[in-house]
Amino acid sequence: MPLTPETLPRHELVGLDCEVVAASNPDVIGISGTVVMETTQMLTLEGADRVWHVPKDSATFAFDLSTETVLVDGDRLVARPARRTENTGDSLWR
């Protein structure tokens, strides 16, 4: 399955450039970097000078694809990465 804006929530996120554009914690808004690790509840972003752990469920992320920037509500990403990427059909994360 190709990486498109429609399929991004079901793809591997590690390696993508990402920015936190909204969050319940105002201190994490504006954090940007490359996704270096993903767990069920967290995205780990490596910036220029540090590594940030951002909760998925309370943030909105902007992922940079080669053609455009895609906004994804973190609630759509809350799942074990392996399970989130293998679901097909009428998926909650689609």
Curated annotation (Swiss-Prot):
Location of the protein in the cell:
Cytoplasm
- One GO term (biological process): tRNA 5'-leader removal
Q: Which key words are in the record?
A: Cytoplasm, Endonuclease, Hydrolase, Nuclease, tRNA processing
The domain of life for this entry's organism is Archaea
In its UniProt record, a GO molecular function of this protein is: RNA binding
Name the GO cellular-component terms: cytoplasm; ribonuclease P complex
**EC number in record:** 3.1.26.5
Catalytic activity, as annotated: Endonucleolytic cleavage of RNA, removing 5'-extranucleotides from tRNA precursor
InterPro entries from the UniProt entry: RNase_P/MRP_Rpp29_sf, RNP1, Rof/RNase_P-like, Rpp29/RNP1
Relate the assembly described in the record.
Consists of a catalytic RNA component and at least 4-5 protein subunits.
Sum up the protein's function in the record's words. Answer: Part of ribonuclease P, a protein complex that generates mature tRNA molecules by cleaving their 5'-ends.
Describe the family membership recorded for this protein in Swiss-Prot or TrEMBL.
Belongs to the eukaryotic/archaeal RNase P protein component 1 family.
Q: Which HAMAP family match?
A: RNase_P_1
The name under which this protein is listed is: Ribonuclease P protein component 1
